[in-house]
Amino acid sequence: MIESYLIDKMFNNAPFLDEMATDQGKIQPHWERVAKYYEQIGSERMRQFHEEVGRQLRENGVTYNVYGDPNGMNRPWILDPVPMIFSSEEWEGIEQGLVQRTELLNLVLKDLYGDQTLIKEGHIPFELIYNHGGFLRQAHHVKLDGDQQLIQYSADLARGPNGRMWVLHDRTDAPSGSGYTFENRAAMTRVFPELIRENHARKITSYYQTFKNTLSNLTINNKENPRVVLLSPGPTNETFFEHAYISSFMGFTLAFGEDLTVSDGYVWLKTIKGLEKVDVIIRRVDDVFCDPLEFKNDSHLGVVGLMEAVRQRKVLVINPLGCRVLENPGLMAFLPKISKHLLGEELKLPSVATWWCGQPSELKYVFEHMETLVIRNIYRGNQKKSVFGGNLSKTELEELKRVIRRNPFMYVGQEMVDFSTTPAWINNKLEARNAVVRTYVVADSENKCYKVMPGGMSRSSPDKGAFLISNQTGGISKDTWVLGKSKEVAASVVKAVKTQPLVRNVLPSRAGERLFWLGRYLERAAYSVRLMRMTLLSYNESDEDIHIHENPVLSTLLQTLTVMTGTLPGFSEKKNLKNPEKELLILVHDVKKVGSLAHCIQSFLTNAYAVRDRLSLDTWRILDSISEELTRMQKSDSTLMQAYQSLDNMVIKLMAFYGLNIDNMTRESTWHLLNIGRFIESAANNCLILKGMLSKSYDSESNKELMEDTLRCNESLVTYRYRYRSNLEMHGVLSLLILHEDNPRSVIFQ
């Protein structure tokens, strides 16, 4: 396995440096243990490990949303079982470079929203800043206490042809990926525990502890222990899993824009018990969407009046509003000179070579070398994709030049870097793929410095020679190991440096509503499954020679199913009663049919995703299995037999969700609202079934069969037999299902 990779590297991968192999086909020293381990286990065992890594991530509910793809919601996170590895000596240099760059960008941020001496003295062209959508004039002279304005920072790095690591992108607005990084490491630790121990891969938990301590040290509204919320765009955002994961993991309240309001100058969280004052907002919403009053007026993701509350120092927002201006790729062309001016130092981590088209000589260079450059808009918010000049025809190049000439200050040309390759497990073998490393830096308020996560999240391209690497374009994530010189003890995120008073975690009103509907859809789905199973069983056992109109039990079941699911006209029409199979299959698997089981399950899952931070890991494993079963149910070529099997599987999974949460949830608002929804739905469906099944009288045998089906649908048949020990009688059935106070399925119990 390793030998074939080395041979392929020597003969087929010549243009690129490789992370594991030298040009002479030798293994890099810091890769030797990993390479030896992979060679020992072989391809078949490696394939099994790959499957196990995927299973671990699926069970943990790790997902990613892909925009513009009908099937892109909650797509399983893909992790390569082959890590990216850095030696401790090389990482020390990278770490120093990242700290220096963060300090530099922090100074630039302070200046741009302060005295603007960098612009006044000509170190940064004013057109580059004032034309960038990330520069928010409303944030001028608005700052956090202390020197550290930039609390979190991420950088995408790649190794260039000269062997040095280059900075490709700066991420300062709402840097993402740290939660996925933690999950990647957790999955790799479970699958390769010995390999991680033998290589002394450094722990990454210290990053989260530093971040939490920095937040706890912020002083606002005269409170030593501030209330922190994580502001998320919502379940459709590409990294919503991470938002829910971090908020749950670190004990923050997950909030959407609709959960917050500004009143009396303060930001308040709308909870089921009233308004709670918010002190710190960790935002995962792009800054221009954070306040529709002062920024993007059509935004539904932010909070009206948030900027004024920040301006009045009634709330702190991290990272500060307006810091997206630092993501401007045009700044990379000026950072070397700015570093000398502000720090008196050369950049330790160079940026990818960048030419800003707002300068005549640079514009000329870009036009003359466009075939070898990547053309980017300076503002990501314009939704303009990077253009690779080498992929364009002469006509397209001329058209691009005309576009740039209209607004030259809005474009940069960047060198098309030949990224290094790294081993990736593709098609059950090791193949070389170009890779980018995302690193993370956090402010340490106690020591007045910045600290770098000793690791990160690497991404490799699924295709050979692909340089545009992102999760949206199918990039595969990789755990990133920094080899330590000795074993180290993992830092606890839960354990803070100093003892802090208990902060009650409140339930936002929006989350409370979602929990209520989660309970309702859970019970609605369970009743639908049970009634559909009985209907399908009755239909399969019915005599083909007897018309359904002449079969009172089956016709009653079908009509009751229509009423309970709210899918009129349904089986109230004679044509559907003549041939019920088509309508039955629609009611089972058509997610577009409002009232169908598939639609009900989809609504159940939607509400569950919205309160992801309130549900346990085991609960998410069950939810993932429900989602997988829903996917199987939606196959258009399914038969009644397959539908019946799906119903059997689904009811077990629904009851597993019910049992796990009813037993394990603390008896607080979350538990009560979930059960209120359940009780209301249970009572309503019980009444509908009783009315549909028992309101008409037929022959004695049919009546008994309908009473038995009614009891089965309410999971009360065994209870009836033990209680009455007699034949089925209407009085006993109604008494048990309506008036019995100890029967959890009776109407009065609800």
PLM-predicted stretches and their roles:
Residues I2-E89:
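N-terminal low-complexity, Ser/Thr- and acidic-residue-enriched intrinsically disordered segments
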Residues Q56-D145, G160-N162, T172-V228, G234-Y245, ...:
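Alpha-helical transmembrane segments and their helix-helix packing motifs
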Residues W91-L112, N131-R137, S247, S263, ...:
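Active-site nucleotide/adenylate-binding loops and adjacent lid/helix of ATP-dependent enzymes
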Residues G134-W166, V280, C357-E371, G390-T473:
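Phosphate-binding site of ATP-dependent enzymes
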Residues Y153-G160, L168-R171, L231-P233, A255-G257, ...:
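Generic beta-strand/beta-sheet core signal
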Residues C290-L293, A424, E541:
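A generic structural signal for short coil/turn motifs at secondary-structure boundaries
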